[in-house]
Swiss-Prot record:
Gene this chain is encoded by: dut
Protein name: Deoxyuridine 5'-triphosphate nucleotidohydrolase
GO MF entries: dUTP diphosphatase activity; magnesium ion binding
InterPro entries, alphabetized: dUTPase, dUTPase-like, dUTPase-like_sf, dUTPase_trimeric
UniProt superkingdom: Bacteria
Organism: Burkholderia ambifaria (strain MC40-6)
Catalytic activity: dUTP + H2O = dUMP + diphosphate + H(+)
Lineage: Bacteria, Pseudomonadati, Pseudomonadota, Betaproteobacteria, Burkholderiales
Parts of the chain that traverse the membrane: none
Length: 148
């Protein structure tokens, strides 16, 4: 898949989104910062990537997801948990960065911060019904299928 990418900050030419391995599902996104940013515990900030994408095809969307190492080791996750980039969005990719950890975290310029995953999208149309055909599960939720 070819994806239109707009470089908003010339420094990002040296830090293009890339797959870390041939089996990677996510492209690494980096913090486009002029200086380090310190996030205190509980603090959230929007971090620019210096990049914009335009998917154009309504059959696709992009997800901005946290990097597992930052979340597990440092408590750095996304403030909105998942960022959804619609196919018609053309603005800068921003990463809502939340320090849910117990200590301050310093985010350095061009550090890998999140990952971008391209996913297929199906736009649903609704069929209004009075009742559903009976299923084995029915309305059971929130643990109704058991713990183990």
């Amino acid at each position: 898949m070819k994806l239109d990418l707009k470089i908003l900050d010339a420094r990002m030419r040296d830090y293009m989104p890339a797959y870390a391995t041939t089996g990677s599902a996510g492209l690494d996104l980096r913090a486009c910062l002029d200086a380090p940013v310190t996030l205190q515990p509980g603090e959230t900030t929007l971090v620019p990537t210096g990049l914009a994408i335009h998917l154009a095809d309504p059959g696709y969307a992009a997800l901005i997801l946290p990097r597992s190492g930052l979340g597990h080791k440092h408590g750095i996750v996304l403030g909105n948990l998942v960022g959804l980039i619609d196919s018609d969005y053309q603005g800068q990719l921003m990463v809502s960065t939340w320090n849910r950890g117990q200590t301050e975290f310093v985010l350095n310029p061009f550090e890998r911060l999140a990952q971008l995953v391209i996913v297929p999208v199906v736009q649903a149309q609704f069929n209004i019904v009075d009742d559903f055909a009976q299923s084995e599960r029915g309305e059971g939720g929130f643990g109704s299928t058991g713990r183990h």
